[in-house]
C-alpha cells in the first residue's frame, strides 16, 4: 500500500461517518426527549400535514362534544321545568274534577277557582323565567336553535321548545250543534280526523225510544274517541220559560208516548203534583222532572232520548210550543284545537245541519280563567237550547230593549220603527228561543228596528244576550265550566307531554351524536399518534445504534490519525 501524508483519507472517512452518526444521535435524542417522531417539517413533510389535519379535526370534535353537552344542559333544564308544570296541570285537573259535582256550592267552587288561578300564575311564572345563560327556554322564542356537533361547518342539530304559557297550551275545540226538533236516522262522518282519512260512525236513530237519541250517538262517538280524538256529550232538557203557575194538564197529556193524564198543579208546583206525576213513569219515558232554582219546570232525559210532549201540559208550565218535541243538543270536544269537520246524511237530526246554528270555539287554558264569553259558553254546551227571553212581561219591544239585562243599549241601532209598537203582539208565553224562531215571531233588521219583511241576514249582528245567551262565570264556578276545564287541562297536559317528547327525542339524538363523535375523536387522535408520536421501543434501538456508532467513530478517527505516524519509520 502507499503511504501519503498530505491527505488522510481514512481520517476524512471517519469524520464523515462521525458527522452522520452525530446527526442521527441528535435526531434520536430529540424524538426521545419530545416523544414526537415529527419535530419539524424536515422530519416528515407529508406526515406532518396529515397529522396537523387530524389534530385539527380531533380538537374540533372535542369542542363539538362540549357543544352537545351544552345542548343537553339546555334541554334538561327545560324538561325539568316542564315536569313541574305538568304537576301543576295535574293539580288543576284534579281541582276541576273536584268542582265537577253538584255537591259543591258556588262558594266552594269559587275557592277552587281561586286555587286554580294561583296555579296558572305559577305555571306562567315557570314559563317566563326558565332560562339558560340568559336565554328564555319556555316563552316560545326557543325555535330552531342550532348546535354545531361536527368537525365541519353546518353539521348541526336543531332544537325547538314550544311555548308553555297558559295562553299557548290547552287549546281545545268545542262545538255544539243547534237544538234538534225532528227525529230521524243520522249517518255521522268525521272528515280528515287524522289529517288524511275520514271516519264513518254507525247509523244512529234520533227518537224517544230506548237505545236511541243523542245518548246513543254520543256512545258511538266516544267508543271511537281514542282513534278519532273527538268526544261527545249531550244535553236533552226542556225547560219552562217562566216559573210554574197554577194550571192543569189535559186528559191526553203524555210524554214519549206514555200517558200521564190530567194533573192539577199549583204555583211553583207547591204540592209537587206535576213533578210527581211525570216522575212516576220516568223509568218508562226516560224523562225526569224537577223544579229548578228559578221555579221553572225542568224535564231532563239522562239517557239522551228525546223528550216529546203530547196533549196539553198546561199554560202554567210555560213550555214553548216549539219545545214540546226536543231531542237536545250534541256537544263535541277535540283536544288539538282544530276544527271538527263533519259530513253525513240527515245531519239536521244531530243538530249539525247546513241551516242550523252551530256554536264553535277554540279555548286555551288561560281563557278558562276569567269570565267565559257567551259565545264560548254556548259552544261548550252550557245552553240546553238557544234560550230566549220572555217578552210578555214588557209593554213593547222597545220597552224590553230599554230594560236592564236586555243586551241592548241606547244608540245600539236597534229600535222599533214609527207606528210599530208591538205591545199587543206578544202573548205571555212567546219567547225568542233561537234566531230561527225569532224570525217566526217578527223579522228583525239592524239599524231600522224590528220591521216586517226583513231577512235572516239583517239580524245577524244582534247581540247574543238578546237571545238569552249570556256570559258565564269563570272556570269551575259552574258544573259545565268545571267539565270544560277538565277537558282543557287534559289538552294542556297532552301539549306539554308532546313538547317534552320532542325534547326527549332531541336529547337522545344529541346523546347518540356525542357518543359517536367521542369514538371518532378517539380514532382520529389514534391515527394522529401513529403518524406524529415516536415509537420509544424502535427509537431506543435507533439511539443505541447511533450512540455505539458515535463511540466507535471516535475510536476509528483516532486510529486513522495515528496511521500517519507509520511514515516516520520509513525515514529512520
UniProtKB/Swiss-Prot annotation:
Entry-linked SUPFAM superfamilies = Phase 1 flagellin
Give the family this protein belongs to, as stated in its UniProt record: Belongs to the bacterial flagellin family.
From what organism does this protein derive?
Campylobacter jejuni subsp. jejuni serotype O:2 (strain ATCC 700819 / NCTC 11168)
Further remark, if any?
The mRNA is localized to the poles of short, probably elongating, cells; mRNA localization is lost in an fliW deletion strain but restored in a csrA-fliW double deletion. Correct localization requires protein translation; mutation of the start codon to prevent translation initiation or a premature stop codon (at position 3) prevents mRNA localization, a stop codon at position 101 leads to partial localization to the cell poles.
The signal sequence is: none
Keyword line = Bacterial flagellum, Secreted
Q: How does it assemble?
A: Heteromer of FlaA and FlaB. Interacts with FliW.
Q: What does the UniProt entry report for the null mutant?
A: Has 2 short flagella probably composed of flagellin B (flaB).
Query: What name does this protein carry?
Result: Flagellin A
Q: Which GO terms describe its cellular component?
A: bacterial-type flagellum; extracellular region
Biological role stated in the UniProt entry: Flagellin is the subunit protein which polymerizes to form the filaments of bacterial flagella. FlaA binds to flagellar assembly factor FliW protein, preventing FliW from binding to CsrA, so that CsrA can then bind flaA mRNA and represses its translation.
The Swiss-Prot or TrEMBL record annotates one GO molecular function as: structural molecule activity
Where it sits in the cell: the answer is: Secreted; Bacterial flagellum
Q: Keyword tRNA processing on this protein?
A: no
Q: Does the keyword Secreted apply?
A: yes
